[in-house]
Structure formats: C-alpha cells, structure tokens
C-alpha cells in the first residue's frame, strides 16, 4: 500500500524564527532594527514578492513603535503653563510630569527624576521648561539631546515673541508635530546623538579649562597691578621720606647753630664779666 507524502509548509516556522532573531538581536537599538528589517525583508522577498512586501512593512511598523516607546511624552512650558505637549500613549506620566514641573527650581539647569522605570528629564532656561519622559533603559544622553534640539527649534520659532503670551496648549497644532519629529530623529540616530554629546562634552571641558586659565591670568594681572601700586606707594613714601629727611636735617642744623650761638653768647658774656670785674668797670687802662 503506497503512502502519500503530505507536504508541510515551513512558512510559519520561518516567520517565527526570523521574527525571534529580529527581536532578540537588536531589541535595544532602533537604528540597527531598521537595517535588520531591510536585510530580512529582502531575504523573505526572494521567496515571495507579495509576502516580502507585507513582511517589510510589518517589521518597519514594529520598529517604529518600539523606537517611539523609548521617548513617550514631551512638553514645553512657560513657568508652570504647558504651551505644547505630545504623546501617543496613555498613562499617569503626564500627571507626574506636571507635578514635577510645579516643584522645579526656576534657575537655569538640567534635572532628571526616576519613577516606575521611567526618567522625567527637564531643561530649564530663561523661564521656559523643556521636558521629555523616557524609558529608564534609554539612559540620559538621548533625552537630554532631544531637549537641546527642541529648545533650539522652539527658540528659533517663538523666541521673544508668541511664546511669551501664549495660552495653555495653544501651540499644540503648530509645534506638536515637531516634538514627534525630534523624538523619532533622536531614537533613530543614537550613534549620531552619542557622537554629538561627546563633542559637546569635549567643547565644554575645553571651555572650562580656558575659563580657568583666563581667571588665573586675570588673577595674576590683579596681583601685578597690586605690585605696581605697592611700588608706586613705596616710591612715593621714599620721596616723602627724603623730603622729610631734608627738612629734619635743616631743622637740626638750625637747632645746632642756635645752640652754638647761645653757647658763644654765654662765653662772650662771661669773658666780658671777668674783664669788667678785674678792671673795675669800664675804667680799666
């Protein structure tokens, strides 16, 4: 009795295997994810064009979603008034971010708070606060680079103008899409962000060294000025001392001459008295 061979389709197993490789090998780097999407979709496309296209767009959508989950919420505020905000997710992170905003110091600085596996990153500058909520595993470098990009773009568009009088959430339509673009860019280009951060850190370090050297030079300049002032004072004091010395010498000379004249006068008087007493007055012959 002939046994018929039942063909088994390997497509589901291939799909699961490739998708598992995709998730486990490049889960933390969206940039590598997109490269893997292209290579895997080309391999799948060689089997079936239609299936390959569907596979490509499916993986690309997964990549985009995973990348966007790294930065989940952002806003720009004037004081405590949120002018524009953007998110594609739901959760209490918006309320937590707003509560942190109320307690932020008004001085220009950067702040990061950790809560429930997320980081709440703030950049405060000139009365405006830029915030982004990120997954804790992303670190601090990408969120801070995102805030710098948002700050520069926001200042170019609204610096000294509309933002100073805008009402709460009034800039959502104009600038909300920009927040989304900056989020996606920072997530898609982590290597570039890392390089820029290193360059900025080096520039900041060099700037700090230069400022320290300038302060030392200025400090030395102040010391030199003090030495010059002291030299001038010593020269002036020496001149005064010479003048006073001359006056004292003259005074002492006059005092000595006066004493000598008095002594000479006393001697002459004594001589006259002796002569007069011997001669019996002025009749001495």
Curated annotation (Swiss-Prot):
Expressed in flowers, leaves, stems and roots. The chain crosses the membrane at residues 262-282. Residues 75-179 form the Longin domain. Residues 283-285 are vesicular. GO terms for cellular component: early endosome membrane; endosome; plasma membrane. It comes from the Eukaryota. One of its GO terms (biological process) is vesicle-mediated transport. Keywords: Cell membrane, Coiled coil, Endosome, Membrane, Protein transport, Transmembrane, Transmembrane helix, Transport. Residues 195-255 form the v-SNARE coiled-coil homology domain. It is found in: Cell membrane; Early endosome membrane. Residues 1-261 are cytoplasmic. It is a single-pass type IV membrane protein. Its main location: membrane. Gene3D superfamilies: 1.20.5.110, Longin domain. InterPro entries: Longin-like_dom_sf, Longin_dom, Synaptobrevin-like, Synaptobrevin-like_transport, V_SNARE_CC. Involved in the targeting and/or fusion of transport vesicles to their target membrane. Belongs to the synaptobrevin family. PANTHER family: SNARE PROTEINS (PTHR21136), VESICLE-ASSOCIATED MEMBRANE PROTEIN 725-RELATED (PTHR21136:SF192). This is Vesicle-associated membrane protein 725.
């Amino acid at each position: 009795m002939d046994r018929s061979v039942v063909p088994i389709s390997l497509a589901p197993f291939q799909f699961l295997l490739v998708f598992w490789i995709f998730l486990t090998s490049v889960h933390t780097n969206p940039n590598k994810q997109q490269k893997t999407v292209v290579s895997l979709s080309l391999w799948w496309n060689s089997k079936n064009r239609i299936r390959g296209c569907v596979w490509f767009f499916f993986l690309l959508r997964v990549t985009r979603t995973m990348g966007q989950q790294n930065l989940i919420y952002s806003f720009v505020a004037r004081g405590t008034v949120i002018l524009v905000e953007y998110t594609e997710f739901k959760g209490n992170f918006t309320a937590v971010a707003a509560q942190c905003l109320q307690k932020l110091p008004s001085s220009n600085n950067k702040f990061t708070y950790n809560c429930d596996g997320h980081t709440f990153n703030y950049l405060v500058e000139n009365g405006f606060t830029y915030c982004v909520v990120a997954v804790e595993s992303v670190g601090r470098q990408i969120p801070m680079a995102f805030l710098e990009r948002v700050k520069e773009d926001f200042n170019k568009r609204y610096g000294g103008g509309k933002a100073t009088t805008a009402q709460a959430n009034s800039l959502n339509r104009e600038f909300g899409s920009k927040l989304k673009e900056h989020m996606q860019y920072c997530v898609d280009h982590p290597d570039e962000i890392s390089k820029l951060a290193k360059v900025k850190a080096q520039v900041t370090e060099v700037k700090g060294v230069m400022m320290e050297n300038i302060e030392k030079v200025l400090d030395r300049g102040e010391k030199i000025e003090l030495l010059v002032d002291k030299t001038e004072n010593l020269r002036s004091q020496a001149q005064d001392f010479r003048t006073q010395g001359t006056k004292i010498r003259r005074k002492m000379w006059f005092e000595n001459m006066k004493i000598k004249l008095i002594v000479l006068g006393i001697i002459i008087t004594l001589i006259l008295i002796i002569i007069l007493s011997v001669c019996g007055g002025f009749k001495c012959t």
